[in-house]
Design a protein with these regions (language model features):
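Extended hydrophobic-aromatic, low-complexity segments
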Residues: 178-180, 196-197, 415-419, 431
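Phosphate/NTP-binding elements of NTP-utilizing enzymes
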Residues: 1-408
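Gly/Thr-rich phosphate-binding beta-strand-loop-beta motif of the actin/hexokinase/Hsp70
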Residues: 400-426
Length: 439
């Protein structure tokens, strides 16, 4: 105080300390959480500081990596269990609004009104508990007449006057309810459970909620959900994990999954750690009692304490598949037991290892795009990203009838319809050709 201001008194001392704490909270999200964010104590009693758990640190690091790189924050979060992913996301959004950017509106979209309201209530509680000096930048005096947060004229909008920003809630039951805003951040929760009917489409709700969000730094869109079969959320998850024929990512969203073994409460110390470790190694190929699966958990990162907990918890279930459904170890397992799947998703993933690139990719054309001449003068031409893929060219030295079996899966003719897929399989049971079209 003496060096900078030439004097010292209690008020000046407090001002300097508050400014130091504000800068600390601005550039250290983890400090902001523990020092100022308070969450419900699951064991009862008073609220407790928000100390990030390893799974929440993993999520926060994903957000921070994008923010520090000057990129828009886009994440699709697959939740295996309730570990505080929504809480961490919402507190991070509050950190952006309070500490970094003014007039930065946000929206919370839930599959039901109760789910969106619950997330918002937690948000309002957080804002109410923050100290006033965090809301004002250096040199700006506190305005004691302004509440930290207040209603925004309608029941689904709240305002933070000192930061000139809004928090809005909407539901998937009302696809148009999110329109008319200028949000910069969106938290879409339990997306896999959003209704999908002729009148309700999750894609329309996402468009209503997120289409106005610019692709610029500090903007944020998060899809988070537990799995629920094949739907819009599963399609978006697959897109986030996929690349095109040039190796470019298909989605702007980064996929993030947190397995049960990354949640620290799912751990138990064995009576003899060395004996337990030796048992895992000795029985690593033993399929009886699922010991091979126990060892596999070790290879993917589970701790000895975590595997021991899993082994004991598994005894509460008649079948290991019931355990895997409640506590999935990887994304494949998470989707395997959700919804109504025809094929065993693990077996599908095993078959993917034997996939190979086609020897030809492009298109086929005739003398005319339609009509009888469409099948005359057929020619192949290579094109990256073409819909025609050939894995085995015909061997003209062979004279063999009925060499190929051709199947057709009929789709629709509109751009939004399923594709019609034509597959030709040679008598050797190798897929020789596949193409898809809107016919």
């Amino acid at each position: 105080c003496w060096q900078t201001y030439g004097e010292y008194n209690e008020d000046l001392r407090n001002t300097v300390i508050q400014e130091f704490l504000r800068y600390w909270a601005k550039y250290d999200f983890y400090f902001y959480c523990y020092a100022y964010a308070r969450i419900k104590n699951k064991e009862g009693g008073e609220d407790v500081p928000f100390l990030l758990r390893p799974a929440q640190v993993k999520l926060a690091e994903t957000f921070e990596r994008m923010r520090r790189a000057g990129k828009p924050i886009r994440v699709i979060l697959l939740k295996a269990r309730q570990w505080g992913g929504s809480t961490c996301t919402q507190i991070y959004m509050s950190w952006i609004q309070i500490m970094h950017v003014k007039s930065w509106n946000s929206i919370i979209v839930g599959h039901q009104g109760d789910s969106a309201a619950e997330v918002k209530d937690m948000y309002v509680k957080l804002i109410t508990q923050l100290p006033e000096f965090l809301f004002y930048e250096e040199g700006i005096e506190f305005d004691g007449s302004l509440p930290k947060i207040k209603g925004g004229g309608t029941s689904n909008i709240s305002l933070i006057p000192s930061r000139n920003c809004k928090i809005k809630t909407a539901t998937a039951m009302n696809p148009e309810g999110a329109r008319g805003g200028d949000s910069a951040m969106a938290h879409c929760t339990e997306v896999a459970f959003w209704p999908q009917t002729e009148k309700m489409d999750p894609q329309k709700q996402v468009k209503s909620s997120c289409s106005g969000i610019l692709y610029k730094p500090y903007t944020m869109i998060v899809y988070e959900s537990t799995p629920n079969g094949q739907n819009f959320y599963k399609d978006e998850w697959d897109r986030a994990n996929g690349t095109d024929d040039h190796g470019e990512r298909l989605s702007a969203f980064e996929p993030l999954f947190v397995a049960w073994w990354e949640i620290e409460e799912y751990r138990l110390d064995p009576e003899d750690m060395l004996e337990w470790a030796c048992t895992l190694i000795e029985r690593r190929n033993d399929k009886s009692g699922n010991w091979d699966y126990m060892y596999w958990l070790w290879t993917i990162g589970a701790t000895l304490q975590g595997i021991y907990w899993y082994r004991q918890k598994m005894k509460e279930y008649a079948d290991i598949q019931d355990m895997q459904q409640e506590y999935p170890s990887d994304p494949v397992e998470a989707f395997k037991y959700s919804g109504q799947l025809v094929f065993d998703i693990y077996k599908v993933e095993q078959l993917r290892r034997f996939c190979r690139e086609p020897v030809f990719q492009g298109d086929i054309s005739g003398k005319s795009p339609k009509g009888e001449q469409a099948v005359e003068g057929l020619k192949l031409f290579r094109r990256k990203g073409g819909e025609l893929k050939i894995w085995e060219m015909p061997d003209k030295t062979w004279r063999l009838e009925n060499r190929y079996f051709v199947s057709v899966d009929i789709g629709g003719k509109y751009r939004t319809s399923d594709y019609s897929v034509i597959t030709a399989v040679s008598y050797t049971h190798l897929r020789a050709h596949e193409t898809r079209r809107h016919l």
